[in-house]
Amino acid sequence: QTCALPICFQKNDFGHEKNLSLMLQKMLIEMQITPKNISFLHLNNGPARFTAIRNCHALMKGFFFGHKVKIFSYKIFEHYFLGINQSFQKNILCIIDTNRRDLAIQKLSPQGKLIGKIKTYLIDNQLIELLSGDYVLMGNGIEKLKKIKDYSFIKKKLMGPIELKSNYFINNVYQKKPQGKFPRIIYPYSPV
């Protein structure tokens, strides 16, 4: 058992959501933050692993219960787009590792607008054909492909980022209108 401030934490085998709520509680007490101190919130609403994102949304809803906050909601692909530090004239393919045998791919315009729907692709010739098109690439799925010899050509098409960072919200301005309510969570990608 470890004690920090007035809260005592016991070693536990809770899921990540319990540990996250304890860390959030400790941070709020140490930094003396209340909902009144926060005027807007940047929120990734998926798609992602549903349990993780659902738990994070539940914690945020509880924290802001009874308090108004402006919410800027981003899909995971838009979050990656915020990490771009140069402009391009080509459309972008954001490639997300689904932690299965496929990858989720979303097309974006050079301005970061989503084009069409998310599609999942097996790592095969159909994916090679798609990635050979006139696109620049970003997303964490690139790490999986870089290890495969048949995909060595993608190194020339990378424009980053290949990992998500929360400071992308600080570094870039993206044309989003704030909402007053928490958005619906986008369910995970459909498996192939």
Task: List each model region and its residues.
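N-terminal beta-alpha supersecondary unit
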Residues: 4-47
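Short amphipathic alpha-helical face segments that pack within enzyme cores
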Residues: 19-22, 58, 79
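Oxyanion-binding and handling regions
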Residues: 4-6, 17, 72-192
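Generic structural signal for hydrophobic residues
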Residues: 24, 59, 145-147
